[in-house]
Amino acid sequence: MSVVGFDFGNENCLVAVARQRGIDVVLNDESNRETPAIVCFGDKQRFIGTAGAASTMMNPKNSISQIKRLIGRQFSDPELQRDIKSLPFSVTEGPDGYPLIHANYLGEKRAFTPTQVMGMMLSNLKGIAEKNLNTAVVDCCIGIPVYFTDLQRRAVLDAATIAGLHPLRLIHETTATALAYGIYKTDLPESDQLNVAFIDIGHASMQVCIAGFKKGQLKILSHAFDRSLGGRDFDEVLFNHFAAKFKDEYKIDVSQNAKASLRLRATCEKLKKVLSANPLAPLNIECLMDEKDVRGVIKREEFEEISIPILERVKRPLEKALSDAGLTVEDVHMVEVIGSGSRVPAMIKILTEFFGKEPRRTMNASECVSRGCALQCAILSPTFKVREFQVHESFPFSISLAWKGAASEAQNGGAENQQSTIVFPKGNPIPSVKALTFYRSGTFSVDVQYSDVNDLQAPPKISTYTIGPFQSSKGERAKLKVKVRLNLHGIVSVESATLLEEEEVEVPVTKEHSEETTKMDSDKASAEAAPASGDCDVNMQDAKDTSDATGTDNGVPESAEKPVQMETDSKAEAPKKKVKKTNVPLSELVYGALKTVEVEKAVEKEFEMALQDRVMEETKDRKNAVESYVYDMRNKLSDKYQEYITDSEREAFLANLQEVEDWLYEDGEDETKGVYVAKLEELKKVGDPVEVRYKESLERGSVIDQLGYCINSYREAAMSTDPKFDHIELAEKQKVLNECVEAEAWLRGKQQQQDTLPKYATPALLSADVKSKAEALDKFCRPIMTKPKPVAKAEAPQAKGGEQADEGKSEPEQPASAEPMETENPAEGST
């Protein structure tokens, strides 16, 4: 069972795996830990990760990046519209109101959803993990931003399904960081809580998390974020600065040229890193646009000045995180900063001023999220034993449930007022389950929605659940218990609906135990029937207080059933009441999510595209094999193979090799795998015999020596007068001698035949034949010459006396297969 953590970043991705010795961040095919989050579509295949990044400059319009900014968001989202303006590829609105990505793939225009593209990237990361673990990877843990909405979380799960992964948990990136920080700490306090602020300034966003640590546990106290404050925003500031400067000085508009924009953005990113350590940074780009070389220079003070609008936004999430946690700056003991954007000196200055202490960098800014994800996966996996460490996560949003009256009442206009109650308030633990009790006479629906969308910029309604049909046996309004679950991924769903009906059952009650039995039954019925009692229905009390909908709104006062309970309590002879539970069907509609059929189709398409990629890679390998064979054989024919082929054959073969080389760069540049395989086999028909003759000449001497040594060894042993061979019969020794003579004669004849042949002729004596002869000789002679001496049988001792008999009895050594009776009989006869 695999234990893998994926940090899917906006710019780069990392893969961490859990092994017996700890957590390792693994290397990709290019021996890098970071894999660019880029999918490039080509005319014949896709290029993903590092290969995609290498193709971006040459193919910008078909290179898809910043996938996390697109997934699970409506096309009309203002933030998405701002992001699209800086993207080199085409993004349009789909029929469902969500973005579609357009690219040329296999020579035709294709449209992909962001979920599909993320699935492609996850599939590539899965391959990296499998190559390092040498096993299939299915179970994993994926890091997501804390601000991801319910729909975005579902989209990540769909992308994982497309990639053939099964996430055990979607964990917030800051929570993963806190886990990686705390699980290795051995000095955490047992009573007093250690409060640590984790600030992640990534490529596109800023996330703040305040966590409280105690020995063996961490508790997330608050989350805060700014979705559009990251390292790329500083890059964009520099890009706009130099684009305007070049427009004035060189009369070129970089923003109108996709390749020029990519080159300038890449240079600005490097410039930002230079300014992190130096007060001044130069910029030089050759042939940026219209064959013009551009130059520029910027000081750190100037950079910070043009970045003021970004820097002013840094304090807001910090203040909100402290406010939600109910802490002051003095209550925060340490500040840990991670992420690529945190290297800007102005950011560190603001953090230092706000917290009154220098931020620490004790964690690897790039790898800590992936390590935390792998640790969380190991904790959830039954195959790994991990140090006991509890993670108490909190939900960053407030979720409410809304409903109207029953369907029959809605038709009559009896349920015009929308009722709602908060089921999962902000900061609610993850996972969690709440139960609500409804009184309905027919099918009805409930909506899962955000209580506050001010910080979300997302539609308030998440999903709608239709509950029913059902029918009460009494013809009255039925009582239904609806369970709402907030799972480990942070996804809210209505889990089940149960119809609760009381029915009376005649039970013969003995006088002795009547009171006790009735009391127990009464308590059980009361616990299940009372709408506002019991731990599992605690949410009913909240719902009643908030909207007063589930009880009196439906015309059935909640106290109506209580006298029945009291009556049952007071009468020992009353019939027993049972609560009959019936599962009620419910249907789910998640707004904007992919349907199951659509996910299955996406899985099939991903399989087809992966197969195409694999075929193209194998085709490249075969083509490279042909090219390599041509160069290698040409060099050897002029060197070590020269004596093993005739002059005429060599000239013809060299001409054939040159012809194949020309074909590779002309007509054969774009052929199928089978054509390259056939071409290589055609060349090997001529080249392999030459190679065989060369190898035979190298190996022949050593194998002949081995056979000669074998012949001489057995001949000497057969003719030896050594006493250790005296037990072997002469006839057997003669057989060995005859076999040695025959092998020697065969070898001599073959050697004479081989000596008359030129090196370019087919060998008469093959090393494989010599090895076989030596093995056959050894197989025949070894059993004869290593036959053990026969073991002399012990003579039965003469029974001259009891003492002698005892000595004869104890003298022979008795193995497990010995027959003791022969030794014991004389002793018995002498007594």
Curated annotation (Swiss-Prot):
Disruption phenotype: No visible phenotype. The modification Phosphoserine is found at residue 533. GO terms for molecular function: ATP binding; ATP-dependent protein folding chaperone. GO terms for biological process: response to heat. It is found in: Cytoplasm; Nucleus. Constitutively expressed. Induction: By heat. The keyword ATP-binding applies. CDD domains: ASKHA_NBD_HSP70_AtHsp70-14-like (cd24095). Residues 509-526 have a biased composition (Basic and acidic residues). It comes from the Eukaryota. Pfam families: HSP70. InterPro entries: ATPase_NBD, HSP70_C_sf, HSP70_peptide-bd_sf, Hsp_70_fam. Gene3D superfamilies: 1.20.1270.10, 3.30.30.30, 3.30.420.40, Actin, Chain A, domain 4 (3.90.640.10), Substrate Binding Domain Of DNAk, Chain A, domain 1 (2.60.34.10). In cooperation with other chaperones, Hsp70s are key components that facilitate folding of de novo synthesized proteins, assist translocation of precursor proteins into organelles, and are responsible for degradation of damaged protein under stress conditions. Belongs to the heat shock protein 70 (TC 1.A.33) family. HSP110/SSE subfamily. Interacts with HTT1 in both cytoplasm and nucleus. This is Heat shock 70 kDa protein 14. It comes from Arabidopsis thaliana.
